[in-house]
A protein has these predicted regions:
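Compact, glycine-rich, soluble single-domain proteins
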Residues: 6-88
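Short, charged, intrinsically disordered terminal tails
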Residues: 1-5
Length: 88
């Protein structure tokens, strides 16, 4: 049985960095880290500097990006991250 997933879009000021189905997202919230899974309650949260990690629904791979701050919006089966990306 497939794990519940949601659409994730990660956008920086320069370009779209990721768009796809994921089963989880963890983010460095400004008041502490938080996680999002399918059917999460709607919310908007500020994120600080740290690692944004997500697990792809199809491959099961966990990927991450270093972010310098931004905003996460969760609405009806979709999550949008607007973030400044920190160079490696």
């Amino acid at each position: 049985m497939a794990r519940p997933s949601f659409q994730l879009d990660i956008v920086s000021p320069e370009r779209q960095l990721y768009s796809g189905r994921v089963v989880s997202l963890t983010a460095p919230g400004v008041q502490g880290g938080f996680g999002v899974r399918a059917r999460h309650a709607p919310m908007v949260a500020a994120i600080g500097a740290g690692q944004l990690a997500y697990t792809e629904a199809e491959s099961g791979r966990t990927l991450s990006l270093a972010v310098g701050g931004g905003v996460v919006q969760v609405i009806a089966g979709s999550v949008t991250v607007l973030a400044e990306i920190t160079p490696p």
